[in-house]
Amino acid sequence: MVYSRARVRAINIKEKISMLTVKDLVKKYPKSERIAVNHISFEVQPGEIFGFLGQNGAGKSTTIKCLTGILPYDSGTIEICGHDMKNDPIGAKMNMGYVPDNHSVYEKLTGREYVNYVADLYKVSEQDRTERMNRLADLFRLEFAMDRQIKSYSHGMKQKICVIAALIHNPKLWVLDEPMMGLDPQSTAEIIALMREHCAHGNTVFFSSHNLDLVKKLCQRAAIVNNGELIEILDLTVEENKTRLEEIFFKATGTYDERLFIDYAAQESADARPDYVPEQEQKDEKEEETK
């Protein structure tokens, strides 16, 4: 069942505990002089779809790998549902589901075996895992392939089995790194619907993307990062911020071109009047006022 954005916002207000809290996060790779993640801080609330935007090398994937416990970080704190990633990593990870950008799965297993393996790690009961696996496999039209080896899957099918595995324990925080990369429109729509449904039940989705249109359509808020630094967090429920998102993103990444933001509708209207001169129109208006 998919709820309206208003319902999602109501859940945000009702719940007080942040699903994800990042404070002053710093990560530097040993053989690099550049700081990959430079004192980043933000919070993500229950019922929220939160976008994480940036170009390649901006620090998105490094931040996500720190959030998920894959990479150690130099300083700062990460809390998932109140569990500190350094002091209580098991508690933090039990509340999180993760879909990586590289299909890190055991390809010699069948889809069903792999999902059951993940369910065992999270101690999901037989009844719950069966119900969730069947429902998600049906949603993704993947029932026919659940007993085939994953190595025989297409790119989209591998992405779907990763999503099923990430949601098998019904995590409060669902983290996805570039989830729509290489997917066909049908698969993209299915994952979008699932993200909205997950949040409608008071859970949270945190995902990285290059796709500004997708983020504007899907997210309540979005953060823009560049060169390891947090540039800005925008509330995308405010309509004017959807335009600002593009401008801030392109300016932050050094790819801003004012031609991208021309009001072409107004330009076409002017072009349809070859004798139109803005200054002359203003002069004519002043003359009319003095009559």
Listing of model-derived features with the role each one plays in the protein:
Residues Q55-G59:
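Walker A (P-loop) phosphate-binding loop of ABC-type ATPase nucleotide-binding domains
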Residues S18-V22, V26-H39, P89:
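A short, flexible loop at the N-terminus of ABC-type nucleotide-binding domains that lies
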Residues N116, D120, D128-A145:
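Conserved ABC ATPase "signature" region
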Residues G76-N87, G91-A92:
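Conserved ABC transporter NBD signature motif
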Residues S209-H210:
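H-loop/switch region of ABC-family ATPase nucleotide-binding domains
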Residues W174-D177:
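Catalytic Walker B motif of ABC-type/P-loop ATPase nucleotide-binding domains
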